[in-house]
Amino acid sequence: CGEETALIHSMEGKRGEPTLKPPFPAESGYLGKPTNVNNVETLANIPIILTRGAEWFSTIGTEFSKGTKVFALAGKINNVGLIEVPMGTTLREVIYEIGGGIKGGKKFKAVQTGGPSGGCLTEKHLDTPIDFDNLLAEGSMMGSGGMIVMDEDDCMVSVARFYLDFTVEESCGKCTPCRIGNKRLLEILNKITEGRGSEKDLQTLSTLGQVIKDTALCGLGQTSPNPVLSTLNNFYDEYVKHVREKTCRARQCKSLLTYTINPELCIGCHLCFK
């Protein structure tokens, strides 16, 4: 569980499902008592704030997002690992100065921030200063601090399907928008990556994704369509290629590939059958 009321229910021996708020845990939480639920990263900032003072801490970061942020930098990048940067550092600085650029000299394509429910941002977003408000405004989020870099060999339709598959598995099942709505989104993405999609499906993805964001009960459900909606907004041409021409430019959707065998080079390994 990641949502605060679901965490509390798990601690009480109940099923890990969220509840409507208010009341918030600070008013009625564990065993009905006032309960403070925070991320470990938030709590880790407390000692240095107490030691050096809030005024010193406020000198780091942006106007509305103070301090630093830890990211798990991964993907098609030369330097992977945990990094800590001041709020306001740009995505470009993280990817190219700290991350060392794209692995193998490939072309940058996208960066996904915020974990499985985060959005996929493009080259035009690289100079965006990292803070809570800026990432939300661009269709992504800070989330758990995940940051995955993608290159020209990644298919953004397949990427959206990958993250949504995770969300469907992790849904607690309590609210209908998340339990059923995300399954419908995943079914459509499977159709598209298998060459059975239509342009009508693209409109359905957009409409249904927004409904889920507006009506799901907890943060997981409300943010789960982000990978779909952000890739639709930023890589719409890839979706169109999949549904109109039944082609995947990144050659990641196996159902859209056509294989040929060169008899002169074939060694009979049968790998092409797998």
Regions found by a protein language model. Give the residues of each.
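Short amphipathic, charge-patterned alpha-helical segments
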Residues: 87-104
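Short, conserved aromatic-histidine micro-motifs
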Residues: 21-48, 112-114, 199-211, 242-254
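Ferredoxin-type iron-sulfur electron-transfer modules in oxidoreductases and energy-metabolism complexes
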Residues: 129-263
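Active-site loop ensemble at the mouth of alpha/beta enzyme cores that anchors a bound cofactor
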Residues: 10-22, 124-141
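C-terminal accessory/binding modules appended to enzymatic or scaffolding proteins
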Residues: 67-79, 85-87, 91, 249-274
